[in-house]
Regions:
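Acidic donor-binding loop of glycosyltransferase active sites
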Residues: 254-270, 283
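Membrane-proximal helix-turn-helix segments that form the acceptor-binding/catalytic region
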Residues: 67, 71, 120-137
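Acidic anion/phosphate-binding donor-loop and adjacent secondary structure
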Residues: 116, 149-150, 157-158, 163-183, ...
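Conserved donor-binding/catalytic core segment of Leloir-type glycosyltransferases
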Residues: 179-197, 203-206
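Short hydrophobic beta-strand element within catalytic cores of glycosyltransferases
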Residues: 284-287, 297
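Short His-centered aromatic/hydrophobic patch
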Residues: 10, 65, 83-90, 107
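Conserved acidic donor-binding segment of nucleotide-sugar-dependent glycosyltransferases
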Residues: 299-300, 304-311, 320-326
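Nucleotide-activated donor-binding/catalytic signature segment of Leloir-type glycosyltransferases, i.e.
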Residues: 229-253
Length: 371
């Protein structure tokens, strides 16, 4: 089977999926030049790579970019085109006005997150084109499946739940130096710092935590919102370590390996690449009990779920886990077991192959030959 995998972003996810799929199909990865630089050293050599120029989103030269992209797709002549959600209205309009091969689209987020400043204007509406033009859709949580079926009236037979695979293995390969020692009282808040991530609730919980565990420390690693709003009078350097910038890829694994817990106090969630990364590095997760988080975190097995916006419950859960080394060890073991089961990329690739077959059959019955 010949597959074309197209992505504009979600590089980590795409790398791991592509490497797993390469064991089963003839795979061509299609991507913008600027994304290719991120992926080039991490891809299986069996994967053919095609790149195209992609200007900034408001640049009208995107018309020519989409023409080049379509020329690549037609030259590959794939049995299936699998697209990672693009958040790009130029692609969406190209999809609307062109005949495509059997199409599978992975939808990572049905709606834009609160505080999202990166999704281009208009993409919130044009992205719906892919909901209806795709023969099969992939989401990473049942809650997203339900949204597509109930709010967007996508037929249930076309919406499939496949877990978000673990990302720890990728970052272990990228890491430099010896893995650090696990710090039994260190917490990690990692990733984009946007309103929906709920950092304010974790910061409000910190005094409650340190009152019971004086040597507890929180690492805040990532960029996004201006952190001065959280620390108008400066931060407590004894208990908070700020890394308010882009974290180099060779340093990411070390942050999770240092930390006893990855904390995700989100107030809204579709799915979570951060949880998938934490589990791949053997770090338990304490997260809000909502959205896709309640599906990826197995409560009391590999993490703890707490009510969103509940500072006391969040503090209690963190203290409980920080104070129990045996429980930490049990949960670390469980996270790594998950990476050999539902979060394993080979298993995810096999599930994805089944959807490719479904997409081909659906396309034959409705669209006929393309190209």
């Amino acid at each position: 089977m010949k597959i074309a995998l197209l992505h504009f972003s979600f590089e980590d996810y795409t790398i791991e999926l592509a490497n797993a799929l390469a064991n089963y199909v003839d795979l061509t990865l299609i991507q913008p030049h600027k994304v290719a630089e991120t992926c080039q050293d991490a891809l299986d050599p069996r994967i053919q790579v095609c790149s195209f120029k992609k200007p900034r989103i408001r640049d009208p030269r995107n018309i020519f970019s989409m023409v080049e992209m379509m020329q690549i797709i037609r030259s590959v002549r794939p049995d299936v085109l699998h697209v990672q959600e693009t958040n790009d209205f130029w692609y969406d309009l190209t999809l609307l006005f062109n005949t495509m091969p059997p199409l599978v689209t992975t939808i990572h987020d049905v709606f834009r997150h609160p505080g999202d400043q990166q999704t281009p204007p208009g993409a919130e509406f044009t992205r719906r084109i892919s909901f209806y033009r795709s023969q099969q859709l992939i989401v990473h949580a049942r809650s997203l499946q339900e949204t597509l079926v109930k709010q967007f009236r996508v037929p249930p037979r076309r919406v499939n739940v496949i877990p978000h695979g673990e990302l720890g293995s990728l970052y272990q390969r990228r890491a430099s130096g010896t893995p650090p020692e696990r710090e039994p009282h260190t917490l990690l808040f990692f990733g984009r710092i946007w309103a929906y991530k709920g950092l304010r609730y974790l910061l409000e919980a910190m005094p409650l935590i340190t009152a019971q565990i004086p040597n507890a420390k929180l690492i805040i690693a990532g960029r996004g919102e201006e952190l001065n709003q959280y620390f108008p009078n400066g931060h407590d350097e004894k208990h908070i370590e700020l890394l308010n910038n882009f974290i180099p890829v060779n340093e990411v694994a070390g942050l999770f390996q240092r930390s006893a817990i990855s904390v995700l106090p989100y107030i809204e969630s579709s799915q979570s690449g951060v949880a998938a990364l934490a589990y791949g590095l053997g770090t338990p997760v304490i997260a809000s009990n909502l959205g896709g988080l309640r599906e990826i975190v197995h409560h009391q097995q590999d993490g703890i779920l707490v009510p969103p916006r509940d500072v006391q419950a969040l503090a209690d859960a963190i203290v409980k886990l920080l104070d129990d080394q045996v429980l930490q060890h049990q949960m670390r073991t469980s996270t790594l077991e998950r990476c050999q089961n539902d979060l394993n990329w080979q298993k995810i690739a096999i599930q994805t192959l089944e959807l490719y077959q479904k997409a081909i059959l659906a396309s034959k019955s409705t669209l006929g030959h393309w190209g």
